[in-house]
């Protein structure tokens, strides 16, 4: 497989910069990822994220009718808690914040830390864990999130766009 990479150490930031330069009216770069360029206040915000390397996930999912922000870690590695916090803070619209990710140890830890910090600041932040990979474990709470991320986040985002409150959106997700 041929790869076009300037420097593997800078891959996520360069990929985000390229995406933002291609869609400057739709995306805005922030530390750790991207958020929508246009803000819709007083709606539940959805931030998605995880390791980079499987594009268009996750930055390519940001836009109207989908996510409000995306946290982009290194290639196949979880983003840091500070990256998750920064993207979530920038994506917050004042009606609660949902953070969606697959069931990977680093993501659970780092997105969970970001949510705790946001809650300590008075933001109603909740984590949405996708556990669709039936091949990875028999117990659904131990399954990873793989292909199911896309449809699960899309349905969740549609509920956010409709203006539903955070409890309704979480119920739809579950």
Features from the language model and the residues they span:
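Short glycine/serine/threonine-rich phosphate/pyrophosphate-binding segments
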Residues: 55-58, 82-85, 106-112, 135-138
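N-terminal amphipathic/basic leader segments beginning at the initiator methionine
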Residues: 1-46
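Short glycine-rich or small-residue beta-strand-to-loop segments that form or flank ligand, phosphate
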Residues: 2, 44-51, 67-70, 96-105, ...
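Glycine-rich, flexible N-terminal cofactor/catalytic loop recognition
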Residues: 32-64, 71
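Glycine-rich oxoanion-binding loops at beta->alpha junctions
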Residues: 54, 58-94
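Short, acidic/small-residue loops that bind anionic groups at enzyme active sites
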Residues: 70-75, 119-142
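Internal, active-site/partner-interface "lid" segment
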Residues: 136-146, 151-174
């Amino acid at each position: 497989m041929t790869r076009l990479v300037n420097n593997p150490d800078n891959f996520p930031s360069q990929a985000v910069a390229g995406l933002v330069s291609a869609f400057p009216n739709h995306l805005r770069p922030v530390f750790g990822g991207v958020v929508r360029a246009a803000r819709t206040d007083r709606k539940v915000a959805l931030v998605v994220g995880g390791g980079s390397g499987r594009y268009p996930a996750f930055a390519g999912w940001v836009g109207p009718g989908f996510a409000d922000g995306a946290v982009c870690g290194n290639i196949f590695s979880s983003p840091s808690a500070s990256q998750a916090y920064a993207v979530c803070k920038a994506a917050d619209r004042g009606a609660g914040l949902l953070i969606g990710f697959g069931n990977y140890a680093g993501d659970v830890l780092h997105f969970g830390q970001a949510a705790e910090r946001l809650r300590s600041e008075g933001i109603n932040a909740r984590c949405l864990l996708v556990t669709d990979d039936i091949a990875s474990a028999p117990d659904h709470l131990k399954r990873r999130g793989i292909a199911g991320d896309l449809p699960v986040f899309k349905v969740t985002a549609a509920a956010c766009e409709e203006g539903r409150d955070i409890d309704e959106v979480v119920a739809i997700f579950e």
